Amino acid sequence: VPRTNIVTGRAFNRISFYGARGAFLEQIQMFAGPTVIWRYDQFGNDPLEGSESFDLSLTARGGWRLSGHAEHDYTDIQNGDYAAYTVDRGAGQVPYAPLSSVEDGFLFSSTLTTPTWQTANASAKISRSRGVIFPEGSAGFETRLTGSLALRPTSSIRIAYSQTFSRIRRDRDGSEFA
């Protein structure tokens, strides 16, 4: 979803090491850096959200790749975004009060990717994260499994399949959000 009326600041650094041709470990890459997002009219003040991340990618002989990602996230939840929300606390409708922020969000993921062979390639990813559930202004945990398979049985036929399983649970009581 394109976002408007924001300013994004991002910096990163990459470090790469290369093994000898034919070595078991042919390449190691690391990326790290922060990302900060402000509302346009509040640029330079407290950010709306941001993260610090670290990525590590290992490429083995034959093109096999194992990647890992770690990230710390923080989000300032804007109460005005939930002004029309109400909840029934037993005595009628009252205004909904979202969390003010989620300061301790995180994301950890690992991906295994096969080489690109003449007729096929595949990948599998598992991730675990904690962050904002934006539709209700609360915090939650997500577990996600993703897989993809691409087949090229002939020079003119391509078949692609992908599947994602995602489970989001609310932080406050462990109930399922999605």
Where is each model-derived feature located?
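Exposed, low-structure sequence patches enriched in small/polar residues
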Residues: 1-178
